[in-house]
Amino acid sequence: MSTRDIIAAQSAAIEPEAFQSAIAAGMTRALLRESAPPCLLRAPTGSGKTFIISRVLEAVSAERPTLWLWFVPFVNLVQQTEDALAANCAGLIPVMLSRGRNQDARAGMVLLSTAQGVARARDRNAGYNADGDDDTRTLAEFVARAKAQGLSIGLVVDEAHIGLDKTTEFGKFAHWLNADFFIMATATPKDERLLEFLQQAGKSAFESFAASRDEVVNARLNKRYIEAVVYDLRQSVQTVADLKRTVLRQAWKRSQRIKKQLQIAGVPLTPLLLVQVANGDKTVEEAEQDLIKLCGVHPALIGKHSSDDPDPVMMAAIANDSSKEVLIFKQSAGTGFDAPRAFVLASTKSVNDADFAMQFIGRVMRVSRPIREAYPKSMPIPPDLDTAYVYLAARF
């Protein structure tokens, strides 16, 4: 291992909750059976899916030396996953796939990538053996060397409902890999799609492990309540522009009320209002001007992500910058980032897909560490601070 592969975790280690330990133990037992079934982890956003899976990988690798390939749907999740593994699992070696495939495979090594990183028809047609040179080992060569060393191969797919379709390039890659261990995780499972994929891949029906919402709420990982205000674009006599401004105005008022409640309670936390807008050239700037002119928000309090493509560094910087009280972002960059200090989400983008709605509502479901520290489990969290508020302009 070279010094550049020693990852310094940026987050603190997590003490497992009882439900997390129970799920990890059950998945480990299933994978270590003589015929390991594919395992699906169903769990709400914020429940610790990455943490649970990392414990499974560590336990399985201790019994059967295994090289793991872990795929996520969004580029900003690669670094988050690497950090979580480094913080919580001394027995695992997280490394980016692009770099790790040029190293010697070893037990507990976890190669991290987006699904798109291996989802290329050109590579598939060449048996994933065409992008090498004197300095770069192909993925096929790397996997073959690992198997020759006696290592088992494990595949982890985060947000499996997105990529695991028999017709997608990533689905075809997963079929080619033919992993000994197969773990899928999702907050919005689509069983029919997963079953179809598994059948095409020659796998048996998966074994399911679930974290209930009650377990996650009682562990103070998710807020207990959701309050949604929906402005139906079909029923209103207001113009679309007026409805969008109403959404922003009401969401900002709610965020400011929460800010005052936190100050009164002595909780050192500045709430963040998330504003999701449609993709387009001027949608972010239009929302910014409405917040400044109609709501009186100081420009310095507003953080913006204007690109159509996610920028993980920028998103994380704004989400963690307590001088910012608003983060405006486009639909295309609206999933796969953490913002624990967010209580309120405003969407001026018409939403008509239930699965996508649940994905972005998950951005305001987490309970921040200052709230958990201010209200230990023996004390109830005040309902207003234990609620995720969602303001939507919708067309159902």
Predicted region positions:
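Inter-Walker segment of RecA-like/P-loop motor cores
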Residues: 90-136
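Walker A/P-loop
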Residues: 34-56
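Conserved RecA-like P-loop NTPase helicase motor core
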Residues: 154, 309-396
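SF2 helicase catalytic motif II
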Residues: 123-183
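Post-DEXD/H (motif II) to motif III coupling segment of the RecA-like Helicase ATP-binding lobe
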Residues: 165-225
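Conserved Walker A/P-loop ATP-binding site and its immediately adjacent core
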Residues: 50-55, 64-89, 114-117, 278-280
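Conserved interdomain linker/interface between the two RecA-like ATPase lobes of SF2 helicase motors
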Residues: 205-305
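Conserved pre-motif I regulatory segment
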Residues: 2-42
